[in-house]
Amino acid sequence: MEVRVAAEVASFLASAPAMIGLLKRGHGRPVLVLPGFLAGDGSTAPLRGLLRGLGHDVHGWGLGRNIGPTDEILDGMIHLVDELRARTGSIDIIGWSLGGLYAREVARLAPEVVHQVITLGSPFQTTGPEQSRVGLAFNALHDRHSDRVMIPRIPSWAREPMPVPTTSIYSRTDGIVRWHHCLNRHLPTAENVEVRGTHCGLAMNPAAVLVIADRLAQKAGRWRPFRPPLAVRGLFPHSDVYEPPAA
């Protein structure tokens, strides 16, 4: 399924100028965008550019390639969040794949700072990296990962409900992670939005971008679940809810 990523990228680049005029505009609140495993800021540059055009104060993470939770990456994210908080008081965080797991944990540690979390193909219901197609590569870098996190085993508390509003954007045709590992439990401030596409193309998937722009346009304290406009409702097939396995 991931072979379709080139088509998603081409569609995004072709439609981006027109999309700017159709998407909801922001309020200037800082938005931090975290890349997926083995990716860096270059992978999120198209999305960040579009969001900047919508009036958001968008930031990449500036920590190079995401090779997993090293001490440098953990400390760098803490410093970046503190820096953004000092400027404005609250931020939105978008995390792609592994970046979404980071985003959720930042929100757990500092819920007073994070306005909301939006994840793209992030398998936060998994129990370990071996349940994805990049598990071998992740485990090969284990010696560089920090002792401050429980890797490769992901603790059960990491899969618990979030203290801030959260939107999980996922695809049933994801070729890297299992889609049901990307689902929030049913809560008033948690939602799951399915789009049609690939894992590696999610940040440039037009339907996903529409969801992101809609979520970021909400004012602080006024979070509501996503409701697609009637004209594009066909882009959003399902809205699944995570069901914990029986004991």
Residue ranges: model-predicted function:
Residues 29-35, 40-42, 46, 50-65, ...:
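Serine-dependent carboxylesterase/thioesterase catalytic core
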Residues 1-31, 40, 44, 49, ...:
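Flexible, membrane-associating and regulatory peripheral segments of lipid-active enzymes
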Residues 6, 21-25, 52-58, 77-80, ...:
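Short amphipathic alpha-helical segments, especially helix-boundary/capping motifs
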Residues 108-109, 114-247:
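Helical cap/lid subdomain of alpha/beta-hydrolase-fold lipid enzymes
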